[in-house]
Every structure is written in C-alpha cells, then in structure tokens.
C-alpha cells in the first residue's frame, strides 16, 4: 500500500481471469466506513458545541438536546448499526459538555485587584500610540492596553516571559467582547504598576519556550537584514509574524487573495520537516517519532500556536504516529480525526475564522487534487506535468476556502486565481529555505548576512509586487462571481464518477 501525494490510499490488484482479460480491483480507502464515521463524529461534536454554548437556557438549545435524546433512544431500539449512532450521540454530548464548561469558565472568572506574576500569552502588539498585550493571570487570560513607559517596557518582552504587575481585573465591555471570549480572554487588566521579576523576566519561562523564543529571535535578526517592508513580509512568510506589516501591505494581500501566505500553515510545517528530514531518516523508529513530535511542538510554540498551526501540526503528528506504528492512513481520515480531537480539546475553535480557512484549504487539497488532476490530464496539460503540479494545488485550495471566504469576507476577487499561481511558488521557496538561511544570517557578520539574504529580498519583492498588481486590477463583481462559479463547476465536474472499461478489445 502506498500513500500518495494527497493522502488517499488506493490499492490496485490485477488478477488474471479467463482468456486475456484482466480485472483491476480498486480498494479506495478514502471511501471506507471509518472516513464517514470520523467525519460524522466531528460534525456531531460541532453540533454539540454549538448547542452547549447556551446550555439549557434557550428554547433552541433545549429543542436541540431533546432531538438528540429522542434520536438516541430511537437508534438504540431500532437501528442495526446502533453502536455507530450511539457513538455519534456520545460525541454530541461530549462536545456540548466541553463547550458549556469553557463558556462557564469565561463568564465566571474572578475579577478585582491583583498583585503578582503575569505571563505573556502573545507577543506585545503595537497599535497606534499604545501596545496591546494578552497575559495569563491566575490561569485566566486578560487583555491590557499600555502606553508610555509601560508600553516601552512591555515591548522588551515576548510571549512566555513573566512580569510583576499590580492592577485591577475588570470585565470586558466592548463590541469585541465575544471575539475576545472565543480566544479565552475573560476580561481586561488595568495595569497600574509593571516591573521585571527580580530573577529575570525568563525566570518562569519553560526551557522549551525559551528555546523557541531564541530561535524566533535569531530568525527576526536575519529578517531585519532585509530593508523596510521586505523584512516584515519575510517574517510573515517564514514564521507567521505579521506584527510589523503596515496596514497598506495587509490590505493589498487581502484584496489580491494572498493573505493566507502570511499565516503559518501546513506548507510551513512540511517545509520544516523537509529541512530536518535527513537527520530524522537516520534515526530508529521510536527516537524518530519522539524527535518529530518535539520539532512539531517547538514549531507550534515558535509560531505562537495559531489555529492554522494547531491544525497542521496535529495532522503531521498523527501521521508520524501512524507511520511509526507501521500502518498507513489517508489524509482525509487524519483531517477528520484532527477536527474531532481538537474540537474536544478547545471547543472555541468552532468560532475561529482562521481555523476554518485552514481546514477548508486542507480539505480542498485532499479531496480535489486528484480529481482535478485526472480531469486536466485529458487536456493538453497532460504533456506538461510541471504545469499540473503548479496549477492543481492552487485551484483545489482556493475551492476549499471559498465557502468560508464568501460567508465572512464576501466574494473573492477573480484576481486571486492568477495572483496565487504567480506568488505561491516563489513564496514556497522562501518558506523552504528561509528558516536555515535566516538563522545563519542572524549569527553571521553583517556583510555575509546581506549576501545570504539578498535572494530572499528578490523573492519577497516579487510576492509583494504580485499582491500590489492584484489590488490595482480589481475586476467588477460580476467577473468575480463568474470566476468563482467556473472554479466550483470545474471541481464538481472533476468529482463526478467516471466509468471506463479497460478490458474491451478493439
């Protein structure tokens, strides 16, 4: 059995029959019962999480739980596959309980004065004349806005480091309250006094976090070799740090459909594993698994555990565990298992746009890459394999994120298709080589560092230029609708079953 590029296992066995006829038997594991069960289990958990937000306080939630209870009883009494459907009901109940527990924790956080240690959860973020930080106080997350000397002091620290603070914990009262709550931020902390801890700001920082921060700092030093906005874009492409990107850059990347490039995704995870592949392949199975999982955890911490990173790292971790066990599993099954597990661990992912964009892009690649490739093989592109490798993944990922993009941001620009085709390959090279070269540049003399980073300056300038052209050449809305419709239509046509009889003799 061989795992192909998108993770769908297809076993082909040829058996000789009477005469010269041959029968090809395809065992497509992508359509196995486990795939359907894991997908349905993730969906049931999602339903439970949505109902669990209100518990039994609203009539819609009460009706939903009543339907689940009635369906569960009916299934147990009547169904032939009752154990499967009972497990789905259990998933819904577990999702509801976890959701209700998390919402209750957010709404029942202790408020009032506080004196003690605050651990930075995120890097300080400059906003206007102030600095925004999110810190963990007594196990709960609070948002703070700092100005003047406090802001300058905060900017000297990074996520994972600790500060001695005195202040007041207050409930959040703003129109962004729900957006903060689904990020586990329970209130606002008004800082009156802030100082470094006597033993040093890293006194309570874990060794693992310290190592990740040091590598991130070295990467930042390498990125700063590039001039102006190029360094900020390089940081976004390689390790997801978009804090230094100007508003104009953020706007043009969004308008051109390239905003996903500055968010760490599965592509970055794959490139990191590719960089260390030679070392990993020389290890035995068990040590290789341990080192792989440690690298994934380190990378997640270094990139600040964004939802897209969590999804990609979890999928890679599950794949490594399955491989170490001497088995194979399709990417679609791993994606469904990832969704199921992470929904239970953090129900608030259900309300994360970045999470759904990441899942959509990954799902598009898994489900559509092979059908699109087969469909395009009937055209002249079949004579140009490099063209297929260039076009197919981009189209599949864009179709995957289309539903979320339309619901949240509106119809995407038709320019996103050519912009992705032109920018993604170059951005991929920057992502693949950026980590080792930027690390070397961070420790090298300035003259050598400039030589090392010079090619990356050309690469990020190309990506930024494509984004600027895409922003400038915005087509009318009807063209956007037509382009999206053609893309969806092509995908649906590619997924239609095709029957071909190979043993007909002419």
List PLM regions with ranges.
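C-terminal regulatory/interaction regions
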Residues: 2-16, 30-41, 45, 55-59, ...
């Amino acid at each position: 059995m061989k795992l192909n590029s998108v993770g769908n296992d297809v076993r082909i066995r040829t058996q000789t029959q009477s005469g010269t006829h041959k029968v090809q038997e395809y065992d497509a594991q992508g359509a196995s019962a486990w795939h359907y069960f894991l997908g349905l289990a993730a969906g049931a958990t999602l339903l439970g999480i949505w109902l669990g937000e209100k518990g039994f306080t609203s009539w819609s939630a009460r009706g939903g739980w009543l339907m689940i209870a009635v369906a569960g009883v009916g299934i147990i009494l009547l169904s032939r596959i009752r154990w499967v459907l009972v497990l789905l009901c259990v998933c819904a109940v577990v999702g509801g309980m976890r959701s209700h527990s998390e919402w209750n924790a957010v709404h029942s956080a202790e408020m009032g004065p506080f004196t003690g240690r605050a651990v930075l959860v995120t890097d300080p973020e400059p906003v206007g004349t102030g600095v925004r930080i999110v810190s963990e106080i007594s196990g709960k997350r609070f948002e703070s806005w700092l100005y003047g000397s406090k802001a300058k002091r905060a900017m000297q620290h990074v996520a994972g480091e600790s500060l001695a603070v005195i202040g007041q914990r207050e409930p959040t009262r703003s129109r962004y309250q729900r957006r903060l709550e689904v990020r586990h931020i329970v209130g606002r902390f008004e800082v009156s006094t802030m100082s470094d801890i006597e033993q040093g700001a890293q006194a309570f920082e874990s060794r693992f976090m310290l190592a990740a921060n040091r590598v991130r700092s070295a990467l930042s030093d390498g990125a700063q070799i590039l001039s102006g906005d190029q360094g900020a874009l390089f940081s976004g492409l390689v390790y997801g740090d978009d804090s230094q990107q100007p508003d104009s850059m953020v706007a043009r990347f969004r308008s051109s459909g390239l905003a996903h490039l500055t968010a760490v995704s599965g592509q970055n995870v794959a490139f990191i594993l590719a960089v260390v592949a030679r070392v990993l392949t020389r290890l035995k199975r068990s040590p290789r698994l341990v080192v792989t999982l440690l690298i994934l955890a380190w990378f997640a911490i270094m990139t600040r555990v964004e939802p897209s990173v969590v999804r990609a790292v979890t999928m890679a971790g599950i794949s490594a565990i399955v491989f170490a066990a001497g088995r194979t599993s399709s990417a679609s099954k791993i994606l469904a298992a990832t969704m199921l597990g992470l929904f239970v661990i953090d129900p608030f992912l259900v309300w994360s746009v970045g999470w759904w964009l990441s899942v959509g892009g990954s799902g598009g690649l898994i489900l559509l890459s092979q059908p699109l490739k087969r469909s395009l093989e009937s055209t002249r592109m079949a004579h140009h394999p490099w063209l297929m490798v260039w076009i197919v993944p981009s189209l599949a990922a864009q179709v995957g994120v289309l539903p979320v993009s339309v619901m949240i941001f509106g119809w995407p620009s038709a320019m996103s298709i050519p912009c992705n085709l032109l920018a993604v390959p170059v951005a991929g090279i920057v992502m693949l080589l950026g980590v080792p070269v930027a690390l070397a540049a961070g420790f090298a003399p300035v003259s050598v560092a400039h030589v090392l980073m010079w090619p990356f300056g050309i690469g990020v300038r190309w990506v930024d230029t494509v984004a600027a052209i895409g922003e400038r050449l915005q087509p009318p809305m009807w063209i956007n609708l037509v382009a999206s419709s053609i893309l969806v239509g092509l995908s649906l046509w590619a997924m239609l079953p095709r029957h071909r009889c190979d043993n007909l003799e002419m």
